[in-house]
């Protein structure tokens, strides 16, 4: 591994990890040879089975978007069964799987269901399935995945039991425990319940989205009745401790369900279960905006209220229910039997985070703590603007800290030479330092223009509140373009220097969100390139005029000039093959659904262009299909961090073109949103991105390769195991300057540095106390104070302020000791 003059790491040259896992040259076909082989074999392999739906022939290299997403969510679930993942983190993956599935049903299944109601004749454009055909497959696969989740969850809870925490059912309790639970229910739960028997004078109630309800079939003298009891998460603690001080818990909904006979004491309970409703979230915003008497922001608030009232799309239940109850619930909720899902696991997994809190002191049950590092490209003693003027800077999250970009904004907010800051915001943190910096800039007299996308799904309320605060501070807030979301991540800082107007431009792949920057992998480019600044300024100007950019020279900007330029760049690689040269395409993105780009990639593959793609989620293109995509490889990486960066590579070095982008290769991104992809002109950064891409392709721990049948499997580890995310963090920790405390550097790195501080101060304390001739209890008291300071210190490990404050305390302690020593002598 070499470090070049610009302190960028070359991870491709002489890298033993890549060399060990690299495919032998003899096994690799050149683009030209692949082209000859394809001609010899014909354009279609005889063993490829063709499918016809309606009047359409389905190519075997296409996959349905929704079914591909379900495969992705299964890969998330597979992480929960990976024994190399710490136990509590495996519980997290079960929770993520369930949350993902909830959102999938709310958004995607809800949309497909709406389409089916309008017309079931329309077919999607890749596998030509109708809406009803898609729903049938989705429901079938969902039930299979729920069984798999149940098996994994039960296994995990058996392991959790070994660490002293257990979730138990009522029938597993002892008599004393049952008596205690009955008293708890009577005194703490029953007075807060709102039970209801359904009848003519008591109509079926509105069931809130994703709330748990206890339902039962009651036998009465005249006829059977259905009753419902809300198990409100806002009222009750989800986990009820069975015996104070024990690690045995019961879910509140299970406790309520058990005591249904007590709640409805005048009836006989024939059957009972817990249910949970998922409501559609697919809403036509344009219908709300038709009211011209209210503002855009008020329209969005109205949409949020309306979304909670949309029709149910799914019902889950936890016990075998009487068919009469299921039919009645389906009728009231306007659901079909296929939209009901039985599962024995809890219906909501938010409680796993409370279990994790109970086990937080067991470090082996969690991922090793990782802290984003300051990039080696940045000198913390120099202004950010001055550094970016000298060279482009690339930040790689979460391995490198977002603090450097925030410092750039804070610097711009107070710099008297800065005239304006323009920025797009899609999803921001609840306590956003980014927005606070923009507010400070406006209050300091800068022109601050912020494009806030209020239509960021499920983040609308947060964006509405921040837009109000920024507006009150003097920022100019705009809300984008009708029918076109602004999803680009761009920031433009304009300032005067040497009687000239200059610019600093930032283009990123992810949101300006401090929280997700520690959880998602993203790239952020900061540059003083005036060509890029000019086109980013044009993007902002067009948005302000409710228009879109029609033509660019450097950037790729959707909806008008991204898809067409990507196709043009792919054509360039095809032309290289015709000229006898090597063609190459590399893509990293979250999803691939754009059929125009997919068809062009199939063409490139058939011409002999080598195509490597790292696609975390949906891929409507199946790799390795004979006669179609033989020269295409697709790998999905699902690990500790959510893969989120987008990279486009065209050609081999040194003539390659590399872009980082906010856009996935999805039709919604390339033709229905404002997205920006920025070219990388700095050679050191290009080399770094190529190296990162190659490491991801070599990932044989968290990477899963797509097979020609559309399924995914992990590569067999023949050389060294490569976890790309761990590799990048080790690189950040090893090659970058990890901040340590000078006073404890001589201790082994295996010691946690906080422990080193305690030990050092413990020794120092007793040595000084002995010198002063004091009794040992003073040393013990001082050690206790050291420990207390350490706890405070540990909570603020990232804060430089606390770091320097503790050093100051330490210095004061030392001075105090010296004064006491002098006093003792006197």
Q: For each predicted feature, which ranges?
A:
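Ala/Thr-enriched low-complexity intrinsically disordered regions
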Residues: 12, 40-45, 765-767, 783, ...
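Short linear/disordered segments characteristic of secreted peptide precursors
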Residues: 16, 751, 764-766, 770, ...
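Short, strongly patterned local motifs
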Residues: 743-744, 752-776, 818
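N-terminal localization/anchoring segments of enzymes in phospholipid and broader phosphate metabolism
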Residues: 2-585, 603, 607, 617-744
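Cysteine-centered motifs
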Residues: 775, 786-787, 812
């Amino acid at each position: 591994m070499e470090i070049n003059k610009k302190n960028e790491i070359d991870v491709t040259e002489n890298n033993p990890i890549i060399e060990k896992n690299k495919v032998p040259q003899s096994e690799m076909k050149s683009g030209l040879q692949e082209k000859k082989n394809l001609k010899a074999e014909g354009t279609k392999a005889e063993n490829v089975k063709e499918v016809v739906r309606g009047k359409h022939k389905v190519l075997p290299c296409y996959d349905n978007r929704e079914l591909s997403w379900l495969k992705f969510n299964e890969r998330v679930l597979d992480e929960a069964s990976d024994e190399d993942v710490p136990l509590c983190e495996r519980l997290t993956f079960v929770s993520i799987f369930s949350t993902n599935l909830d959102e999938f049903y709310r958004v995607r299944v809800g949309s497909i269901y709406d389409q089916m109601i309008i017309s079931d004749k329309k077919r999607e454009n890749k596998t030509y399935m109708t809406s009803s055909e898609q729903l049938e497959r989705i429901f079938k696969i969902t039930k299979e995945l729920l069984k798999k989740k149940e098996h994994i969850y039960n296994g995990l809870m058996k392991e959790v039991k070994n660490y002293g925490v257990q979730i138990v059912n009522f029938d597993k309790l002892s008599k004393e425990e049952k008596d205690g639970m009955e008293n708890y229910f009577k005194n703490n739960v029953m007075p807060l319940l709102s039970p209801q028997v359904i009848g003519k004078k008591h109509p079926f109630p509105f069931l809130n989205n994703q709330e748990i309800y206890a339902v039962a079939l009651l036998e009465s003298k005249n006829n059977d009745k259905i009753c419902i009891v809300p198990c409100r998460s806002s009222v009750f603690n989800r986990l009820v401790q069975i015996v104070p001080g024990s690690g045995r818990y019961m879910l509140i909904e299970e406790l309520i369900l058990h005591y249904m006979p007590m709640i409805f004491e005048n009836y006989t309970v024939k059957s009972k279960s817990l249910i949970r409703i998922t409501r559609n979230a697919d809403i036509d915003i344009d219908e709300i905006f038709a009211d011209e008497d209210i503002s855009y922001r008020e329209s969005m608030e109205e949409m949020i209220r309306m979304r909670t009232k949309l029709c149910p799309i799914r019902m889950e239940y936890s016990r075998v229910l009487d068919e009469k109850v299921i039919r009645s619930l389906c009728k009231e909720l306007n659901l079909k039997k296929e939209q009901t899902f039985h599962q024995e696991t809890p219906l909501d997994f938010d409680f796993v985070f409370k279990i994790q809190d109970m086990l937080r002191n067991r470090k082996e049950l969690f991922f090793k703590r990782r802290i984003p590092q300051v990039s080696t490209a940045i000198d913390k003693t120099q202004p950010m603007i001055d550094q970016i003027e000298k060279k482009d800077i690339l930040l790689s999250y979460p391995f490198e800290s977002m603090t450097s970009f925030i410092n750039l904004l804070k610097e711009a907010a107070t710099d008297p030479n800065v005239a304006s800051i323009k920025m797009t915001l899609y999803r921001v943190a609840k306590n956003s330092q980014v927005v606070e910096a923009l507010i400070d800039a406006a209050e300091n007299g800068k022109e601050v223009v912020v494009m806030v996308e209020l239509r960021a799904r499920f983040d609308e309320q947060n964006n509405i509140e921040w837009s109000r605060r920024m507006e009150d501070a003097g920022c100019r807030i705009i809300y984008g373009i009708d029918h076109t979301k602004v999803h680009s991540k761009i920031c433009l800082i304009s300032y005067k220097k040497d009687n000239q107007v200059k610019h600093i431009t930032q283009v990123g792949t992810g949101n300006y969100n401090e929280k997700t920057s520690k959880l998602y992998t993203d790239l952020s480019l900061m540059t003083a390139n005036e060509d890029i600044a000019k086109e980013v300024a044009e993007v902002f100007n067009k948005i302000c005029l409710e228009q879109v950019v029609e033509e660019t020279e450097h950037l790729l900007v959707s909806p008008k000039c991204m898809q067409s330029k990507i196709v043009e760049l792919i054509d360039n690689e095809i032309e290289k093959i015709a000229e006898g040269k090597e063609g190459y395409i590399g893509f990293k993105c979250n999803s691939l659904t754009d059929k125009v780009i997919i068809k062009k990639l199939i063409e490139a593959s058939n011409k002999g262009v080598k195509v490597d793609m790292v696609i975390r989620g949906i891929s409507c293109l199946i790799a390795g299909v004979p006669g179609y995509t033989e020269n295409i490889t697709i790998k999905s990486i699902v690990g500790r961090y959510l893969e989120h960066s987008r990279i486009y590579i065209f050609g081999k070095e040194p003539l390659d073109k590399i872009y980082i982008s906010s856009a996935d290769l999805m039709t919604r991104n390339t033709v229905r949103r404002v997205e920006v992809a920025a070219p990388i002109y700095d050679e050191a950064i290009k080399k770094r991105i190529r190296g990162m891409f190659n490491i991801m392709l070599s990932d044989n721990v968290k990477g899963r390769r797509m097979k020609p049948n559309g399924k995914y499997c992990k590569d067999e580890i023949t050389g060294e195991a490569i976890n790309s995310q761990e590799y990048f963090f080790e690189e950040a920790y090893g090659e970058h300057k990890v901040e340590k405390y000078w006073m404890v550097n001589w201790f082994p790195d295996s010691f946690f540095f906080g422990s080193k501080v305690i030990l050092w101060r413990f020794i120092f304390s007793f040595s000084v106390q002995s010198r002063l001739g004091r009794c040992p209890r003073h040393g013990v008291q001082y050690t206790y104070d050291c420990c207390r300071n350490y706890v405070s210190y540990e909570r603020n490990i990232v804060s430089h302020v606390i770091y320097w404050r503790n050093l100051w305390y330490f210095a004061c302690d030392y001075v105090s000791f010296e004064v006491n020593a002098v006093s003792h002598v006197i």
